Every structure is written in C-alpha cells, then in structure tokens.
Amino acid sequence: MATYKVRLFNAAEGLDETIEVPDDEYILDAAEEAGLDLPFSCRSGSCSSCNGILKKGTVDQSDQNFLDDDQIAAGNVLTCVAYPTSNCEIETHREDAIA
C-alpha cells in the first residue's frame, strides 16, 4: 500500500493543507479524519457537491458516475470517491466548475 501527499487548497475558504492519504482511502474520508471540513452530499460519486479541480497529480475516481469524460479531462474530481494514485494538489470547494 502506498501513501501519497495530497494538498487541498482554496484561497476563498482560507484552506491550504497537505495531508497523507493511503491509496485505498477516499480523499474526502482522509480529509475528514485530518479535521478538515470539505463540502459533500451523497458520498457516492453521484452529485457535484464535493467537486474539486485536480491541479497536479493523478487520482482514481472510477467509482463515480456523475462526471462525463470532458469534465474529467478538465480536471474535475469528486473527492468522495477519489483515491490518490500519486502526490497531488486539488483546489476544493469547486462545485461551480461543473458546467
């Protein structure tokens, strides 16, 4: 099992934290365990409440069923069902990015 450093940030929310996330744990779950308050609703990858923008790195979000290929290519990531597959940086609180 690998563990990756995941930077979660949003200037408007005053958030800039780096947490360690095992490759078998969802990013949202690890953030909550670290005491961070990130937005979410369904926790099943079926809505956009937890959407973030992947700025660096890679994730596996194959459990989600909401984002289309274009939205994923644009960097959208549903943190409730995303596993890190490398060190990464995610701009959180970005439900507004889904068009």
From Swiss-Prot:
Keywords: 2Fe-2S, Electron transport, Iron, Iron-sulfur, Metal-binding, Transport. Residues 4-96 form the 2Fe-2S ferredoxin-type domain. Its cofactor is [2Fe-2S] cluster. One of its GO terms (molecular function) is electron transfer activity. InterPro entries: 2Fe-2S_ferredoxin-like_sf, 2Fe-2S_ferredoxin-type, 2Fe2S_fd_BS, Beta-grasp_dom_sf, Fd_pln. CDD domains: fer2. SUPFAM superfamilies: 2Fe-2S ferredoxin-like. [2Fe-2S] cluster binds at residues 42, 47, 50, 80. GO terms for biological process: electron transport chain. Belongs to the 2Fe2S plant-type ferredoxin family. Ferredoxins are iron-sulfur proteins that transfer electrons in a wide variety of metabolic reactions. This is Ferredoxin-2.
